[in-house]
């Protein structure tokens, strides 16, 4: 999260994959890697899409996150700022649920990463 959100090389690779018809998948705090990706038309990749992420309420209330002060930004806030429809345990029926929107597959619950991979495989078949 600290080094991927503003990594321009990574953003370029992700944008090229998506714009070439590829599938992008993220889990846990991994949604930070796509939050600032811009497509060739200048729009954010996440704009208008449902993306699973940790809720601000978790980040700001948990001691392991130092009540949000340890993090460079709150993923839910940044996703919403960039036009996404952030999804999390407060909006999903199950925190381990996988969200698929267009060709972006996401989960807020890192142990669901295998389910993200399965959905990605289904999308490329």
Where does each model-flagged region fall?
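Active-site-adjacent pocket-lining segments in enzyme domains
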Residues: 1-25, 29-125
């Amino acid at each position: 999260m600290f080094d991927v959100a503003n990594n321009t090389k990574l953003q370029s690779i992700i944008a090229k994959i998506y714009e070439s018809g590829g599938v992008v998948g993220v889990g846990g705090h991994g949604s930070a890697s796509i939050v600032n990706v811009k497509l060739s038309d200048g729009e954010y990749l996440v704009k208008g899409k449902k993306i699973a992420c940790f809720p601000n309420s978790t980040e700001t209330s948990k001691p392991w996150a130092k009540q949000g002060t340890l993090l460079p930004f709150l993923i839910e806030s940044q996703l919403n700022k960039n036009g996404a429809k952030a999804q999390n345990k407060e909006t999903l029926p199950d925190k381990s649920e996988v969200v698929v929107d267009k060709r972006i597959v996401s989960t807020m619950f890192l142990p669901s990463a295998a389910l993200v991979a399965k959905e990605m495989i289904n999308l490329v078949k």
